[in-house]
Structures are given as C-alpha cells and as structure tokens.
Amino acid sequence: YQKTLIETGHPKRGDIVVFKYPEDPKLDYIKRAVGLPGDKVTYDPVSKELTIQPGCSSGQACENALPVTYSNVEPSDFVQTFSRRNGGEATSGFFEVPKNETKENGIRLSERKETLGDVTHRILTVPIAQDQVGMYYQQPGQQLATWIVPPGQYFMMGDNRDNSADSRYWGFVPEANLVGRATAIWMSFDKQEGEWPTGVRLSRIGGIH
C-alpha cells in the first residue's frame, strides 16, 4: 500500500492510523480507528457488520448507537488464492482479476461500502471465511465480540476484514503508540518483510495477517 503520514492529534472515528503494534512496538501497523475512547464496539462475525455505541464507559448505560450502514455486497476486482508449499506451509496471494475471469485456487473477494457516522470507505471480505471467534480478545466483564474502549485507547480494524490481525484479536491501541494518520489503506494487510507480493503466511489466528 502507499501511505502518506499526517501529523496526528486525537484520531477521529474512521481515520486511517499508523501505530506501533502493541505486542511488538518495532512493527508499524496501519488500520482504521473504528472505536474511540468510551465507545462500545460489537462485531457480528456472521454478517461482518459493526455496531458502535459512543459514551459507554464501564458501568454506564449506553442506549444511543452511531449510525453504521452498509451497501449491498458486490464482487470485487480482487481474487485471493490459497495454496500449500512443499512441507505443508499454507500461503496466500492477492491478484486483480477481471470479473469475467477466474484464477486457479482462487476465491473472488466481496466488496461493500461501510459508513461510520459521516465517514464512508470500502471494505473487503472473503465470502467463505468466518472469524475464529474463540481467538478474539475477550475484555474482562464483556461478552465475546464486544469491547468497551478504555480512556486513552483505540479500537483498530483493517478494511481487508477477513485478512486483518487487528483489535478483534489483540485488543486496544494506547494513544502513546500512535505514529500518525495516513491517507490510504485499501488492500493493505499485515505481512512479514519479503512476503509480498508472492504470498503471506497464515497466522496463528487462522487468517492472513
């Protein structure tokens, strides 16, 4: 992906943010800030849709939900391939393929628009993929797949939803880890050096980072 860093203050909901990965601060990640401090974030792994309720500090009733809307699901221009190398290591790659063509061992990704309040962006999903919800970060006192963002922290998600290791799996990003805002995230995904564009290792959470 291409990214242009912009000086960051407090990210707004929907901003694309570059930050130090909390579990390994040597790594920079780029994700979208979907949850701000005090937000209650719920993700439905079946419909792959978000519910966001602002102003839900612990122990406080929160009834108002942020308007979150989705366009119809459509085929995207991208195909994701899956294969195994000698020795059984699973790899994956992304290719731009005309909609009237197919690719061996490939699955065409779906695309739709997600609107968080007044911010609209495109997201990608893999039609056959389901999150391993049991690997989600479970916040103490909250149901699985529901998180209340603590003060001074943020809930980040990738737009390439089924190929993103993000706050669903490892929790919140402290404000101190923020590096800057960015202008592009489309088709980015977490990777190890040297593994793009030939493929990426399947992560321990069962998706592609």
Regions found by a protein language model. Give the residues of each.
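Soluble "head" domains of membrane/secretory-pathway proteins
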Residues: 1-209
